[in-house]
Design a protein with these regions (language model features):
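Short acidic/histidine- and often glycine-rich active-site loop of Leloir-type glycosyltransferases
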Residues: 360-374
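Short hydrophobic beta-strand element within catalytic cores of glycosyltransferases
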Residues: 355-358
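Donor nucleotide-sugar binding/catalytic pocket of nucleotide-sugar-dependent glycosyltransferases
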Residues: 187, 191, 203-246
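A conserved mid-protein helix/loop that constitutes part of the nucleotide-sugar donor-binding site
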Residues: 34-38, 272-286, 340
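Conserved donor-binding/catalytic core segment of Leloir-type glycosyltransferases
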Residues: 21, 209, 256-275, 281-284
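Acidic anion/phosphate-binding donor-loop and adjacent secondary structure
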Residues: 192-197, 234-263, 306-307, 412
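A charged, aromatic-enriched C-terminal amphipathic alpha-helix characteristic of glycosyltransferases
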Residues: 245, 379, 393-426
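Conserved acidic donor-binding segment of nucleotide-sugar-dependent glycosyltransferases
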Residues: 269, 319, 370-381, 389-393
């Protein structure tokens, strides 16, 4: 049986109540849920607007600045995947139970009959699942929104909805019914794959948020948006990697432990059809012929990673901590096929002084900045190989720039930008 949690993150007297309605937040199903949880927790406590925020340097404390009070945040989500985790377990919880699960027959068929070329779920079966579950979620949410509206009328509070991913169509439908302005985060190709289903949720949103102007441009080319807002992925570097000394020591030890320091080692993390599986099947043997010294280390699990193990210049390592990956590699490679959602691993590589080579699609150029090389979307294999060679030859300088650029997704900066978006859409 599916359960819906109402997670009370924080209450203040600011007169703003944020109502986040979505399928998953905690327990998180992936990075998108962790990102939104970080943003919501961030605006629930005191903090500055973007224009008042200091320049945040990863792993360093920030200077004191004027702070705004936190806002009230409620999260309406399914808990069918389990109980809350340390991500939000320090919050007060109110729990309500819903009678339907996250997955159903149609979502199961969509996955089992997924497209062999793209690796994406069967569109027809997935659409059938999404239509049904969004309809149910919307009806369930309406009961809570009605009481939230009554409470807001009595207190004079402003309401703002927030949603993302699979159940965002149902959440948006409920917000629209009660005249509640709302924000939608676009994280991946979902809305592009099901344009008719998600069009209303996006075009009627007070703002659509994405990580990177490039991604927002992709969204705006398909859906007429009222407002697009860049909110970077929030990464708490200190929580993930410790102190400056931890990161620098890890990198020094990793490089010192290498017995092949003259061999170019290129790291690839996570492989799916969207993240380059077909492309790597062409690139890896090409590089083996024209740059035989180079070696690729592929990290992650699943058939797509294993499918690259047959190339002589490639070693597959399975799931490995990011800090271990970037402790000893020379450069990092990431590509996408269609949707340019921000590659946060690019900036995590940068924190360790590792430059990246990526593709000119969506937000990838913004993620790389001047800390690596961007290859045109339709470039041939020779251009990719030359980019890898150039990045390797200039890895010291590009790595230094990548470390400087890592601050763009520091969670404190992202939270300040999200706080400013909320202020602007509500006209505070």
């Amino acid at each position: 049986m599916g359960r819906f949690d109402v997670v009370v993150v924080c209450r203040s007297a600011m007169g703003v109540r944020i109502l986040a309605a979505l399928r998953d937040l905690d327990p998180p199903a992936g990075g998108a849920e962790m990102s939104l949880a970080t943003l919501l927790k961030g605006v629930s406590i005191q903090g500055p607007y973007a224009e008042d925020a200091p320049e945040y340097i990863p792993l360093h404390p920030s200077e004191d600045v004027e702070r705004e009070d936190g806002w009230s945040v409620k999260v309406f989500q399914s808990s069918d995947r389990g109980d809350v985790t340390s991500l939000t377990d320090d919050s007060e919880l109110e729990r309500d139970v819903c009678s339907f699960p996250v997955e159903d027959l149609w979502s199961g068929l969509a996955w089992r009959l997924r497209n062999k070329s793209s690796g994406r779920p069967n569109v027809g079966f997935q659409r059938r699942h999404l239509r049904g579950v969004n309809r149910k979620f919307s009806k369930w949410l309406e009961g809570y929104l009605e009481s939230e509206l009554e409470e807001a009328k009595k207190s004079g509070d402003l309401l703002l909805g927030v949603t993302q991913l699979h159940w965002s169509a149902g959440a948006a439908r409920a917000f629209q019914k009660f005249g509640i302005p709302y924000i939608v985060f676009v994280r991946d190709e979902l809305q592009f794959d099901h344009r008719d289903l998600y069009k209303s949720s996006l075009v009627n949103a007070t703002a659509v948020c994405g990580a990177g102007q490039g991604l927002l441009d992709q969204i705006g080319a398909v859906f007429p948006l009222q407002r697009g807002a860049h909110v970077p992925l929030p990464v708490d570097y200190a929580e993930r990697f410790g102190t400056v000394e931890n990161v620098e020591g890890c990198r020094e030890q990793g490089l010192a432990s290498r017995t092949d320091s003259d061999v170019p080692r290129i790291a690839i993390i996570g492989v799916t059809p969207e993240k380059g599986y077909g492309f790597y099947q062409r690139l890896l043997p090409y590089v083996a012929r024209v740059w035989p010294q180079a070696q690729f280390d592929v990290y992650g699990g699943g058939a797509y990673v294993e499918g690259l193990a047959r190339f002589a210049n490639t070693t597959c390592h399975g799931h490995t901590p990011v800090s271990e990956v970037f402790s000893s590699c020379d450069l990092h490679l990431l590509t996408v096929r269609s949707t340019g959602s921000w590659g946060r691993v690019i900036n995590e590589a940068g924190l360790f002084g590792v430059p990246s080579v990526s593709v000119d699609i969506g937000a990838q150029p913004e993620a790389v900045g001047n800390g690596g090389i961007i290859v045109p979307a339709h470039a041939d294999l020779q251009a990719w190989c030359e980019a890898l060679k150039h990045c390797y030859t200039n890895r010291a300088e590009l790595g230094h720039r990548a470390k400087e650029h890592a601050k763009v997704i520091d969670h404190r900066r992202s939270i300040a930008m999200f706080r400013s978006v909320i202020r602007d859409v509500l006209g505070l």
